[in-house]
Structure formats: structure tokens, C-alpha cells
A protein has these predicted regions:
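Basic, Lys/Arg-enriched alpha-helical interface segments
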Residues: 1-72, 83-96
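Short, surface-exposed coil-to-beta transition loops
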Residues: 75-77
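Catalytic-pocket segment enriched in acidic/His residues
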Residues: 80
Length: 96
């Protein structure tokens, strides 16, 4: 379940508020990003995100240690911290 968002743009997108902040995201990834956030919200366990394999769930390292990501496409990721059975600080980020 999504417990909190890491930025207002991601929160606005998820809640259907197509604000100026949301316009920074490419239009072609919006539906896929929403679908991935719906999967994240439905997850009861981190392992639930291993399917489908296209999510490519991975634990991040370095400055992002403690965070995980799932892929939206080659360039964009949903990044979050999984604690207490939920996703915290959820953000849609350009990973490259």
C-alpha cells in the first residue's frame, strides 16, 4: 500500500490532479506509471512486486540504500522505501 509520496508531482499524478507539476512527466509514460503505482498500492508484501517480471524490482544502493525501484520503462522508475508493510516516499523519477 502507498503510505506517502516523495514529491507533489507524483502524488498529484496518482490522485488524478493534472497540475503544472505533472506536466514535467512525458505524456507517453503516464498510463504505465499509474498502472505501476496501482500495483504498488495493491502490494501487501515487497515480494508481490516481483510479478510481472517487467517490474524488475531491485534494491537500490549508494545514496539510495534502503530504497527499491520498479521500472516504468527503460528511463523512468517508481522509487520507494518499503517499511511496515507499505511503500513510503513514492516518487516517479528519471533514472538516467
Amino acid at each position: 500500500m502507498i503510505e506517502s509520496f516523495g514529491d507533489r508531482a507524483t502524488e498529484d499524478l496518482y490522485h488524478g490532479r493534472f497540475s503544472a507539476r505533472v506536466k514535467r512527466f512525458p505524456k507517453e509514460i503516464l498510463s504505465a506509471a499509474l498502472r505501476k503505482m496501482d500495483m504498488l498500492n495493491a502490494a501487501c508484501f515487497l515480494e508481490d512486486l516481483k510479478a510481472p517480471p517487467g517490474n524488475k524490482l531491485e534494491a537500490l544502493r549508494g545514496d539510495m540504500k534502503g530504497f527499491h525501484s520498479i521500472r516504468v520503462n527503460v528511463r523512468w522508475r517508481i522509487v520507494f522505501e518499503w517499511r511496515g508493510g507499505g511503500a513510503h516516499d513514492v516518487s516517479l523519477v528519471d533514472y538516467h
